[in-house]
Amino acid sequence: MLKSNLEVDNRFSLIGKVADFPKRNKSPSGIDHCLFYLEHRSNKKEAGFTRQAWCKIAIQISGNQLIEKTQSITVGQQLLVVGFVTSHRSSNGLNQLILHAEQIEFIE
């Protein structure tokens, strides 16, 4: 626990553009899921030099609270996504980092 009493053991936030069409499905237990990729680009200072930062990360949204927000997500739209990260092993055996969204904010 930090001095500010915040629990941030696995907290991740990223601003980026939606890179592909969201894929929606429902689990056998009836939970709605939405998956899409978010692409981030920025310039950051590191050791006195400017470097380009770029990443493309899978965003997983689950449950009724946020699923309604996903209905208006379109390719190219800029979003702030806050949540926690997990690793998922794909069918080809590669590990992929996934950001599980707990908060989504549309940026105009």
Swiss-Prot record:
GO CC, any one term: primosome complex
InterPro entries: NA-bd_OB-fold, Primosome_PriB/ssb, Prisomal_replication_PriB
SUPFAM superfamilies: Nucleic acid-binding proteins (SSF50249)
Top-level lineage group: Bacteria
Presence of the UniProt keyword DNA-binding in the record: yes
This protein's UniProt keywords: DNA replication, DNA-binding, Primosome
Annotated SSB domain residues: 8-108
GO molecular function: single-stranded DNA binding
Subunit-level organization: Homodimer. Interacts with PriA and DnaT. Component of the replication restart primosome. Primosome assembly occurs via a 'hand-off' mechanism. PriA binds to replication forks, subsequently PriB then DnaT bind; DnaT then displaces ssDNA to generate the helicase loading substrate.
Function: Involved in the restart of stalled replication forks, which reloads the replicative helicase on sites other than the origin of replication; the PriA-PriB pathway is the major replication restart pathway. During primosome assembly it facilitates complex formation between PriA and DnaT on DNA; stabilizes PriA on DNA. Stimulates the DNA unwinding activity of PriA helicase.
Family: Belongs to the PriB family.
UniProt name for this protein: Replication restart protein PriB
